[in-house]
A protein has these predicted regions:
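Alpha-helix boundary/capping detector
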Residues: 3, 66-67, 142-143
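Positively charged
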Residues: 69, 144-149
Length: 181
């Protein structure tokens, strides 16, 4: 009986620790889409929050940013609300910094374009001046990939239509972002 309780306890602990860093549609770890700035202190009570509010040294910043650090001083996430200076604002964008955070299918900040393409449905690719933005709607994510990975003839300008086949599978993610509009 004790052995069964121990195994069950280990399973529950493992499941909870996995969910703490899981990325799903409408959820990033402990944070859900409906959470507001006001709730961040209680959600991350065991972590550290650095608040870069658009004042003082950051007064010319167009956004407030909330940097979430673990107790081990590892930068985990950067959260940006829709509007500045309003604690009732929901979080609009999340930059995934730590490789602890991953999708159910194992995609994290160290993944490649090929892994994303293999494990998630890509809904669109936007060509910008220096980067590609790869959209994965089923997890509210977009991935920024440097255009330096593309063949030379596709790197310049924004008018070229970039298809999945044009992006080398070993292209690394520059940024892993979650967008909640």
């Amino acid at each position: 009986m004790r052995k069964k309780c121990l195994i069950l306890s280990i399973f529950i602990f493992y499941s909870c620790s996995q969910n703490e860093y899981r990325i799903e549609k409408g959820k990033v770890g402990k944070l859900i889409k409906e959470n507001t700035v006001r709730q961040l202190d209680s959600i991350y009570s065991n972590d550290s929050i650095v608040k870069r509010i658009g004042e003082g040294d950051y007064m010319f910043s167009g956004d407030d940013k909330y940097l979430i650090y673990s107790r081990k001083k590892e930068h985990l996430l950067t959260l940006t609300p829709r509007n500045q200076h309003d604690p009732s604002e929901p979080i609009e964008t999340i930059q995934i910094i730590s490789d602890l955070f991953q999708t159910k299918k194992g995609i994290n900040v160290n993944s490649t374009f090929g892994e994303i393409d293999k494990k998630h449905q890509i809904n669109g690719i936007q060509n910008t001046i220096n980067n590609l933005i790869v959209y994965v709607d089923n997890i509210d994510a977009y991935f920024i990939i440097d255009k330096k990975n593309l063949p030379l003839e596709l790197r310049l300008g924004t008018e070229n239509k970039i298809e999945k086949i044009n992006i080398p599978t070993d292209s690394k993610i520059k940024r892993f972002m979650i967008g909640w509009n």
